[in-house]
Amino acid sequence: MKKFIISLLSVVALLSCTKYEGVRVMSYNLRYGLADDGENSWELRREASVRMLEDIGPDCFGVQEALDFQIDYLLENTDNYKYVGVGREDGKKSGECMAIFYSTSSLELLDWGTYWLSETPDFPSRGWDAACRRTATWTLLKHKSSGKLFFYVNTHLDHVGQVARKEGLSMVVKNISSMNPNNYPMILTGDFNVFPEDPCLEPLDRIMTSARKAAVDSDEAGSFNNWENDRGDIIDYIYFKGFSGCSKFKVVREKYGDVPFISDHYPIYSDLVF
């Protein structure tokens, strides 16, 4: 308890400093843009998504289920964002892109890549018992005002294959360790399609910290609403390591515009302190 209080006071002290340095990161499952969702179709939700991004103002955010025309819309209607990522079907534009967006006003992209969650990670492929091809996109980013470097990884685990979820996340965990010999701070976001008590999260919990659990100001709401107001399953996550603390974790349940939902997943975001 004493250690927790000291840690809490340290984060609060950092936040009270006028030269506070940190990263606001978001995970947002946009919902597949070609789905027949009626009143919840992308064309009716896309403006609300832009309003949400303008309101929250993440330094970087990872999206899931994004198709190229959804990415293009976000780029065209927001300021100062660029993105990296490839389509999972061909390594170019086809299929879901595990895109990472970053603000050019606060961050500089130094390197990036995408790999497939499969036995052949360098090529478009489906792994184990997965229903779909799954990928992870990683970036090495520089925080301009502080000069600090950090890695950011974004992924989407399979919704059907239990083995694919376990092995896919295991691959991500191994890569997180091997890709970072300089021990830079690290962020992982994604739709993991598992609840917090799922055993497949145990290897990740050993090397990284859940922002939901660690935040000074946290949020108990679930993230997957399935177009229902009274529903909220926790299947979307933000993990971190190498940061001094997490000041905030929030599930974005506010309405933006006239649409009932901006997606079948509520966006989640965290404020991480260097």
Where do the language-model regions lie?
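Bacterial Sec-dependent N-terminal signal peptides
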Residues: 1-22
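N-terminal, active-site-proximal structural segment of metallo-dependent hydrolase catalytic domains
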Residues: 15-77, 90-95, 274
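Active-site-proximal beta-strand elements of phosphoester/diester hydrolases
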Residues: 22-34, 98, 110-115, 148-158
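Short, Asp-centered acidic motifs that coordinate Mg2+ and/or phosphate
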Residues: 23, 59-60, 150, 185-187, ...
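Catalytic metal-binding/acid-base residues of hydrolase active sites
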Residues: 31, 67, 156-158, 192-195, ...
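Structured beta-strand-rich core segments of catalytic domains in phosphoester-bond hydrolases
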Residues: 60-149, 245-252
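Metal-dependent phosphoester-hydrolase catalytic domains
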Residues: 140, 163, 167, 174-186, ...
